[in-house]
Structure formats: C-alpha cells, structure tokens
C-alpha cells in the first residue's frame, strides 16, 4: 500500500501540476502560439497583396511604356511630316527665288542688249557721217549732223 499511496500522491501531484499548467502556463503559451499564427497569416496575406500589387504595377508600367512608345512614334511621324513640309516649302521658295533671279538677269541682259544696239547704231551713224564728210570733203554743221544721226538711228 505504501506503493499505492506513493502512486496516489504522485497522481494527485501530477493532476495538480497539470491543473496549474492548464490554469497559468498553458493560456500564455496558447496566446503566444495564436499570436504567432496570426502574425504568420498576416505576413502571408501581406506577401500575397504585395505580389498582386507588384503584378499590377508591372502591368501598369508595361501599358505606360507601350503608350509612351506609341506617343513617341506619333511625334516622330509628325516631325517627319513637318520636315517634309519644310523641305517642300524651302524648295518652292528656292524655285521662286531662282525664277525671280533668272527674270531679273534676263531683264538686265535685254536692257544691256538694247543699250548696246543703241550705242552701235550711234557709232555706225557717226562713222557713216564721218565717211560721208570725207567723201564730200566738206564739214556739215552740228545741227545738220545731229539731224542726220537721228534719222539714221531711226532707220536702223
């Protein structure tokens, strides 16, 4: 019985120990475990949200990059059109300037040609009068000479 009383004492001590652990030790341990489980669950949920946010950000970045490339392409096309337009305008302006310069040069050539013809006519008339004076061997007065030159110029 001695052994039974020892076993009974040990059983009572064990039951008291279990009750004490259940009452004072077990609740803080369970609270710590539950707190840790909650933190882990929150961390996993946060990681999942972060992954979704990252995927969304990458999709937005890809969309913005596509939009930027499209806008850049439009700007490049507009710049090329404007460049072509400026070149066409410059060519047209250069053509007009060339036409103007050619017309001015032609007018100057025509004026110079007329002046040279008039000068040549006067010289021919003077030479003709000089030749006629030598043939006649007499001097014609200045008024008559001028009259003859004018008539000769008009005939030429």
Swiss-Prot record:
Entries under Pfam families matching the protein: ATP-synt_B (PF00430)
Residues annotated as signal peptide: none
Subcellular location as annotated: Cell inner membrane
Main location: membrane
The entry's keywords: ATP synthesis, Cell inner membrane, Cell membrane, CF(0), Hydrogen ion transport, Ion transport, Membrane, Transmembrane, Transmembrane helix, Transport
Function: F(1)F(0) ATP synthase produces ATP from ADP in the presence of a proton or sodium gradient. F-type ATPases consist of two structural domains, F(1) containing the extramembraneous catalytic core and F(0) containing the membrane proton channel, linked together by a central stalk and a peripheral stalk. During catalysis, ATP synthesis in the catalytic domain of F(1) is coupled via a rotary mechanism of the central stalk subunits to proton translocation.
PANTHER family with a match to the protein in the record: ATP SYNTHASE SUBUNIT B, ATP SYNTHASE SUBUNIT B', CHLOROPLASTIC
Protein family (similarity comment): Belongs to the ATPase B chain family.
Subunit structure: F-type ATPases have 2 components, F(1) - the catalytic core - and F(0) - the membrane proton channel. F(1) has five subunits: alpha(3), beta(3), gamma(1), delta(1), epsilon(1). F(0) has three main subunits: a(1), b(2) and c(10-14). The alpha and beta chains form an alternating ring which encloses part of the gamma chain. F(1) is attached to F(0) by a central stalk formed by the gamma and epsilon chains, while a peripheral stalk is formed by the delta and b chains.
Protein's name in the database: ATP synthase subunit b
Species of the source: Enterobacter sp. (strain 638)
